[in-house]
Amino acid sequence: MARAAGARGPAGWCRRRGRCGRGTLLAFAAWTAGWVLAAALLLRAHPGVLSERCTDEKSRRILAALCQDYQGGTLAGDLCEDLCVAGELLFQRCLHYNRGKKVLQADWRGRPVVLKSKEEAFSSFPPLSLLEEEAGEGGQDMPEAELLLMVAGEVKSALGLELSNSSLGPWWPGRRGPRWRGQLASLWALLQQEEYVYFSLLQDLSPHVLPVLGSCGHFYAVEFLAAGSPHHRALFPLDRAPGAPGGGQAKAISDIALSFLDMVNHFDSDFSHRLHLCDIKPENFAIRSDFTVVAIDVDMAFFEPKMREILEQNCTGDEDCNFFDCFSRCDLRVNKCGAQRVNNNLQVICDKIFRHWFSAPLKSSAVSFQLQLQLQEAVQECADPGVPSGNTRRAASSVFWKLRQLLQATLRELQEAEK
């Protein structure tokens, strides 16, 4: 069997004939490149194929090691006592492992939460150099100014933003005490996780991101919300949507779509820099009971300065300038991608989410055919604007308001039908 397998393709033909021409070698190179490209595309489309198997047994071992480090004074956190001593933060099940990231479900005093970390072990994170260098018990003599400088530098590395000292409150380890060294080491591990930094920064500024509930070492806890999935008929679980069958779901979808629009406008306008979402798919969002959209995975979210830094790479064509859902254009005069993103969050949401809902008639006869047709056309225009890159922002603003008005009109028709 091994011999037969090895004889396949141009290389096998060469061995059988005993010679290879230049054309055959070129064909073999193309054949090999095709397989390499296919493998790369498979890994990009399905990164989970290289992920570890998510098991409850391994997850329990990970948390046991975390608690052992806590009891040894290596790490600290406001959830460590509940997890490791009081038994009030209880592991429930493994949700997923993905390229090192561990995501676990737990119960915290009767509340479902998610424990997250970019790495399995606390020792996987580089230590804070000041802790290694400073003499004195627990680094108690460490100058506060140096700490602030290092925290600000790590936040800038994660976000690409310069923050004032007064903005660093979410990441300050608190008063010095017997666990000060463990607190600093834990803070440093958390600051090396971009998602934690985003959630911490935005939790008091946005209803569309998860608040951080607490942490223990390198693991942090957020609210558990059921993620979307392409396996759901409506992308998100809407089984309990109020109202009559069909009409209730149509109303829920319209409410959720309006919340997506609110999130887009919020991320575009309400921070000092635009926030770009480069991995838009149902699995990265969840819906609250009031149909508010929440971004539950922001590993691929970037503020404008960081986005420009990521996009501005060498290129030989436009395809080299695509960073997941964030696209740029290749300037062939200098073989460099433009730093300006040429598509936008709304365009990708229309393409990957709204198309699923509005490309076919809504499951409710209460919405007029004309309104449904207008909504379909607006979603198509949004997903594929067909305008020069310099005009995309103006076009996005126009279609944003058009979609908003059509969705509000849809809700009015559904509400009238309920009377």
From Swiss-Prot:
TM annotation in the entry: 23-43
Cytoplasmic compartment spans: 1-22
Membrane topology annotation: Single-pass type II membrane protein
Mod. after translation: Among the many cysteines in the lumenal domain, most are probably involved in disulfide bonds.
Motif (May mediate ER retention): 16-17
Pfam families, sorted: PIP49_C, PIP49_N
InterPro entries given in the database record: FAM69_kinase_dom, FAM69_N, Kinase-like_dom_sf
Lumenal side: 44-419
Keywords: Disulfide bond, Endoplasmic reticulum, Membrane, Signal-anchor, Transmembrane, Transmembrane helix
A single Gene Ontology CC term: endoplasmic reticulum membrane
Chief location bin: endoplasmic reticulum
Cellular compartments annotated: Endoplasmic reticulum membrane
Keyword Endoplasmic reticulum attributed: yes
Annotated SUPFAM superfamilies: Protein kinase-like (PK-like)
PANTHER family documented for this protein: DIVERGENT PROTEIN KINASE DOMAIN 1C, DIVERGENT PROTEIN KINASE DOMAIN 1C-RELATED
Protein family per UniProt: Belongs to the DIPK family.
The name this protein goes by in its record: Divergent protein kinase domain 1C
Protein's gene: DIPK1C
